[in-house]
Each structure stands twice: as structure tokens, then as C-alpha cells.
Regions:
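Sec-dependent bacterial lipoprotein signal peptides
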Residues: 1-15
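Intrinsic disorder/low-structure terminal segments
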Residues: 10-12, 39-42
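Short strand-turn motif at the edge of the Rossmann-like AdoMet-binding core
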Residues: 49
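Rhodanese-like catalytic fold shared by cysteine-dependent sulfurtransferases
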Residues: 4, 17-36, 43, 52-84, ...
Length: 125
């Protein structure tokens, strides 16, 4: 009986450790991102790829801020306020998720992530 109780307690403890934390940013579809860009041109569209990737093609109006160079100062240079809506993308969606987390850590409150440009079905320049 003691062993069974210990096993149940251990299982409860382990399942409690695997609970995922909720995202602090919003994940949106690329269609929703495009609709927001069209409706609200003051949104900041942030490309977190490297310069050469950005130069090869980017979403019109996107501002380059490579993932590795995001700091409080560099973010403030391209995002006017902490409440300004920011939509983040990269090549495949990995770096954009990391960047969204960093921006939330820096105090940005309206961060959205919409994946990568490789699946972007709309215009690029």
C-alpha cells in the first residue's frame, strides 16, 4: 500500500512538472498577419533573419532586426513604444518564436508571431 501511494505521488509530481507555460505572445496565421498589415499600416513588422536573408527578399515594410542583435536599445530604435503592435517573422518560424519571447522579456506587450517567409503566400520585395 505504501509503495502504491508513493508511486501515485511520484506520478502526480512528474505530471505537474511537464505543464507548459502559456505563451506571452500571440501566434497568428499568415493570413491574419496580412490582414492586420493591410488594415493597420502603423504595425511594426519585424524580420529577425540576417541581413543577407533580408536582402534576398522580405515582406514589404518589414524592418530588419536580426535575432542575435535584439537588445533593449536596438528594439527601442525600431519599435516606438512598449504597447505598439509588433508582428515578428523569420525564415521558418524558429527564430521568430525566440525573438517574440525576447521582446516580451524586454517589456513589449503586444507581440505577435506568424512563422516564416518560406510559407508566406503574399508579395515580397
Amino acid at each position: 500500500m505504501k509503495k502504491l501511494l508513493s508511486l501515485i505521488l511520484l506520478l502526480l509530481l512528474l505530471t505537474g512538472c511537464s505543464v507548459q507555460q502559456p505563451l506571452r505572445y500571440q501566434q497568428i496565421s499568415q493570413q491574419d498577419a496580412k490582414n492586420l498589415m493591410d488594415a493597420y499600416p502603423d504595425y511594426v513588422v519585424l524580420d529577425v533573419r540576417e541581413q543577407h536573408e533580408y536582402d534576398a527578399g522580405h515582406i514589404p515594410g518589414a524592418v530588419l532586426l536580426p535575432l542575435g542583435s535584439i537588445t533593449k536599445e536596438s528594439a527601442a530604435a525600431v519599435i516606438p513604444t512598449s504597447t505598439c503592435p509588433v508582428m515578428v517573422y523569420c525564415r521558418s518560424g524558429n527564430r521568430s518564436k525566440q525573438a517574440a519571447e525576447i521582446l516580451c522579456d524586454l517589456g513589449y506587450l503586444n507581440v505577435m508571431e506568424f512563422g516564416g517567409i518560406t510559407t508566406w503566400p503574399y508579395e515580397i520585395e
